[in-house]
Amino acid sequence: MKYFKKLVGERIYLSPRNSEDVEQFTEWLNDFNTTDYIGRSGASVTLDTEKEYLSRVSKDTATFVIITLEDNKMIGTVSLEQIDDINRNATLGIFIGDKDYRDNGYGAEAIRLILEYGFRYLNLHNIKLDLMEFNERALKCYKKCGFQENGRRRKCKFINGKYYDSISMDILAEEFTGDFIKIRLLSFVTITFDILFCSVFFRPVPPAFTTISVVTSRPPFT
């Protein structure tokens, strides 16, 4: 299956989702070990419902599959949903469907790539997410990526015979760009106010600067 290196990290890249991926996603979304952690255990997912979901959300969603660079294997998905162009916010969704790739840092890398895409290219200001209170690994990962807890809805999800809280978290553009800008500033030998201004506020770089090459510690977008 053909994938495209839209956003490239150290071990993974994000590619636009193909319609051919539906069968694999349907298998993942019928596994309670996956759906319990994303709050979708009560849903009955078929090939038809997954195809309908994909066509419906594509209008206001940036959805990517997570592909390993080493062997070009699809291991999960990450997305920015409910993108609000006026208020510049969106909701992040992610899951690693392939169990062999969980707890190995692939999710955190995918989150950093999608955040950089959302803040740097979509000009978003606030990105939020929700998770179940028992998903301690995800909570630790989100905090590591810069998300802050901003509230919880008590006992709103019924999973496997018990009610659980849903935790809400978010991150602002300026909170994410702290480390992002530091990495890039250390790479400049000289810097002008214009370049700094464009980097901080994520505005398009004027034509005069389009030939500037910036060497960073991260792989470039391709």
Predicted regions and their residues:
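Conserved GNAT acetyl-CoA-binding A-motif
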Residues: 120-130
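Glycine-rich phosphate/pyrophosphate-binding loop shared by adenosine-nucleotide-utilizing enzymes
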Residues: 12, 73-76, 164
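Acetyl-CoA-dependent GNAT
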Residues: 43-101, 172-176, 181
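Conserved acetyl-CoA-binding loop-helix of GNAT-fold acetyltransferases
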Residues: 103-117, 139-144
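Conserved catalytic-core motifs of GNAT/GCN5-like acyltransferases
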Residues: 128-131, 148-164
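Short amphipathic, helix-prone segments within low-complexity/disordered or flexible regions
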Residues: 185-189, 194, 200-220
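A short, well-structured alpha-helix characteristic of acyl/acetyltransferase catalytic modules
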Residues: 1-51, 175-182
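Conserved active-site tyrosine of GNAT-family acetyltransferases
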Residues: 142, 147, 169
